Amino acid sequence: MILLISDLHLQEERPDISRAFLDLLDGRARHAKALYILGDFFEAWIGDDAMTPFQQSICQAMRRLSDSGTAIYLMHGNRDFLIGQAFCKAAGCTLLNDPSVIELGGEQVLLMHGDTLCTRDLGYMKMRRLLRNPLSLWILRHLPLSARYKLARKLRSESRTQVRMKSTEIVDVTPEEVPKVMAAHGVRTLVHGHTHRPAIHKLMVDGQPARRIVLGDWDRRGWALQVDEQGFQLAPFEFS
């Protein structure tokens, strides 16, 4: 069994989500061969050198799962792209490139966070290119902690404002981009998060039937994609 989740947006202000994640680690994930976390794991991450006690507790729980034999793979999201190798080493997880192609359920599957598919959101794409270039990443990681906290608060506030102002079409994936990206990677299944619109979409890629599986965000309930001998099963679950 393989589990895939995304968009937990872990933060101290939402202990219900944190408890649900810890329950997953102590429960279903213990029986999984691997757990994939496809971005926006944390609501914000300003650097491995600034871990709070809350974030350290999550890291330690992940390490316990890793030590028990479940492999953990973590992909950057737009909220936590400063997660680095120091955190991953402590948590016992592997940092996964976005995009990545893995073998899943007997086929090659493309994994993405999903934000790069939203090409109609020109303002976001411009900001993403600015923040993700190597020079910007170096500068961000070497800013004083106070400056990083201030910048993170500013970006989160602006992001919430922009999402409210933009149409749903702009902040969703660009329909034409999806088959193009899938064809470029030679896959018929894509799994991503980011949009908070869980669903399984059918489409055609190079004249062949294909599917796009969108993971759900964790808010009022959690979401997980389970891949086993029964196939690909996307389903929500209630927080205990």
UniProtKB/Swiss-Prot annotation:
Pathway given in the UniProt record: Glycolipid biosynthesis; lipid IV(A) biosynthesis; lipid IV(A) from (3R)-3-hydroxytetradecanoyl-[acyl-carrier-protein] and UDP-N-acetyl-alpha-D-glucosamine: step 4/6
Which residues are in coiled coils?
Answer: none
Cite the GO molecular-function annotations of the record: manganese ion binding; UDP-2,3-diacylglucosamine hydrolase activity
Q: Which cofactor does it need?
A: Mn(2+)
Q: Does the keyword Hydrolase apply?
A: yes
Which GO terms of type biological process are on file?
lipid A biosynthetic process
Root EC class: hydrolase
> Which residues does the record give as Mn(2+) 1 binding sites?
D7, H9, D40, H196
| Superkingdom field | Bacteria
Key words, A-Z:
Cell inner membrane, Cell membrane, Hydrolase, Lipid A biosynthesis, Lipid biosynthesis, Lipid metabolism, Manganese, Membrane, Metal-binding
Q: What does the entry list as the binding residues for Mn(2+) 2?
A: D40, N78, H113, H194
Signal peptide limits: none
Q: Where in the cell is it found?
A: Cell inner membrane
Q: Name one Pfam family in it.
A: Metallophos
In short, the EC number is: 3.6.1.54
* UniProt keyword Hydrolase present: yes
NCBIfam families recorded: lipid_A_lpxH, PRK05340.1
Which HAMAP family does the UniProt entry name for this protein? Answer: LpxH
* Family assignment from sequence similarity: Belongs to the LpxH family.
Q: What is this protein called?
A: UDP-2,3-diacylglucosamine hydrolase
Source species, please?
A: Pseudomonas putida (strain ATCC 47054 / DSM 6125 / CFBP 8728 / NCIMB 11950 / KT2440)
Q: Which gene encodes it?
A: lpxH
